[in-house]
From Swiss-Prot:
Gene symbol of the encoding locus: ABITRAM
Record keywords, A-Z: Actin-binding, Cell projection, Nucleus
GO cellular component labels: dendrite; filopodium tip; growth cone; lamellipodium; nuclear speck; nucleus
The protein, known as: Protein Abitram
UniProt KW Ubl conjugation keyword: no
Length: 181
C-alpha cells in the first residue's frame, strides 16, 4: 500500500506579520547598520522596534541598561497621555531620540523615532528586563508606540523602505563587506 506524501503544513503568519506592515529605516542618522523597523498597523499606529541587523541584536552583545532620559529636562517616561484626543503626548520628529541603549562593551546606541507623531507609550518592561529587547524585538521588546497625525499617516512611509527593499540593502552590505575582506 503506497503512502500518500504528507501535505506540507501551511505556514501561519505571526501576529505581527498578520496585522502590521513592516517599514525599515537603514543607517539612522548616518550610523552604519543602526537600522530601525517601524511596524505600521492599519489604524495608523506605529510601533518602533530595532531591525534584525541592528548591532544590539547581533550575537555577543549584552545590554547593560536602557534609558528613556534623553536630556536633563526631557524624559520619555514623563509622557502622560489622556483622553480621546491623546492630550499630553510628547510630539516627536523623525530624528527625535526615544531612548539610549548602553551595552556592556561600552557601546551606546540612540534609538530614534523615524516617524513624526505623538508618543503614545514607551515600553517600560525593557527597563527592568533589557534582554527582552534582544529575545523578542518585534513583540515584547518594542521601544515605543507613536501615533502619526491623521493628515501625515499616508506620507510617513515616504522615507522608509519596504521589507523587499531592505533585504536588497542587506545583500548590498554583505557584498560590500565581503569585497573589502
Amino acid at each position: 500500500m503506497a503512502t500518500e506524501p504528507e501535505a506540507a503544513e501551511p505556514v501561519v503568519p505571526s501576529l505581527v506579520d498578520r496585522y502590521f506592515t513592516r517599514w525599515y529605516k537603514p543607517d539612522v542618522k548616518g550610523k552604519f547598520c543602526e537600522d530601525h523597523c517601524i511596524l505600521q498597523h492599519s489604524n495608523r499606529i506605529c510601533v518602533i522596534t530595532l531591525a534584525e541587523s541592528h548591532p544590539v541584536l547581533q550575537s555577543g552583545k549584552t545590554i547593560k541598561s536602557i534609558s528613556y532620559q534623553i536630556s536633563t529636562n526631557c524624559s520619555r517616561l514623563q509622557n502622560k497621555v489622556s483622553g480621546k484626543f491623546k492630550r499630553g503626548a510628547q510630539f516627536l520628529t523623525e530624528l527625535a531620540p526615544l531612548c539610549k541603549i548602553y551595552c556592556s562593551d561600552g557601546e551606546e546606541y540612540t534609538v530614534s523615532s523615524c516617524v513624526r507623531g505623538r508618543l503614545m507609550e514607551v515600553n517600560e518592561n525593557i527597563l527592568h528586563k533589557p534582554s527582552i529587547l534582544q529575545e523578542k524585538p518585534s513583540t515584547e521588546g518594542y521601544i515605543a508606540v507613536v501615533l502619526p497625525k491623521f493628515e501625515e499617516s499616508k506620507s510617513i512611509t515616504e522615507g522608509l523602505l519596504t521589507q523587499k527593499q531592505y533585504e536588497e540593502v542587506m545583500v548590498k552590505r554583505i557584498n560590500a563587506t565581503t569585497a573589502t575582506s
